[in-house]
Amino acid sequence: MRPAGAELVEGREILPGQWQQSWHAPAVVSGARAGQYAHVRSREPGGFPVRRPYPIATADPASGTLTIQVESGSRFGAWLAAHRPGDRVDLLGPLGRPFEVDPRSRHLLLIAEGPGIAGLRLLVDEAIRDGRSVVLLYGAASSAGVYPSSLLPDEVEYVVATADGSLGRAGSVGDLVLEYEAWADQSFACGPPALLARVAALAAGRRGRLGVATLGRKRGGGRPVAAGSPEARRKAFLQVVLGQDVGCAAGTCLGCVVEGAGGPVRVCREGPVFAAAELDWGLE
């Protein structure tokens, strides 16, 4: 896969320190699926030599544009957020393994906190397009950090929790999961490690008793499927997308390795999407 030039179409601050950017990059948009990411690098002489990964938040094949969500708190993020329409960068993508939705799933539960919404946003569009029902649970510290509902399709049921109670429910977004898990055929999460570990623990305690795992069972259990395969992930109640920094995106630098249930796994190649049971959450 070769890097493609991308031109900024629009950039706007949607939350304090968080920018939504729309890039014209038809070569990257083509074939992009929810959960995948793009690698961004400067085209300027003397610019940042290392690429940074950004989840593909939306992708429109008709216009050839995609959106990413940029936090301006880091040097790279501040540099990228300062771009103006017409500016260009190198994009490499789509990269990584996407979410796998079981064809039988009609009810999808999405769980996000803070910038983690970017890792799930394209899944919202894909699910609505395919006629599925979506509940999005979103958590933030306060109302100032809540993802704007105007950026979501009207068909989505959007439920917010804030730590200070200034908007929606008071508390953590993880507190809301128990209210909706029985409704869901599958669930998908993106956010800080503490949130992912919490929802993974909930899913582990109910494995085989919720969602698509309970559908179409045959005596004898059917044929086994390999852990980490698309088929195995489609049967999982919970999939997560990890937000580790990805250096080479080719699996060679090993800078994004995390501990899996069966040994080390590379976020850039085996992920960034995993079935929750594939990862070692330290729950023993």
Place the predicted regions along the sequence by residue.
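Short, surface-exposed secondary-structure boundary micro-motifs
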Residues: R43-P45, P94, A261
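Short microdomains enriched in Cys/His and/or Lys/Arg
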Residues: R269-E284
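Ferredoxin-reductase
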Residues: M1-P85
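FNR/FR-type flavoprotein reductase catalytic core
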Residues: R75-G243
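Structural signal for conserved beta-strand scaffold positions within catalytic alpha/beta enzyme cores
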Residues: E10, T58, V160-T162, V240-L242, ...
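Short, Lys/Arg- and Gly-enriched loop/turn segments at beta-strand edges
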Residues: G46-Y54, G96-R104, C268
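Local cysteine-cluster metal-coordination motifs and their immediate loop/turn environment
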Residues: G119, L242-P272
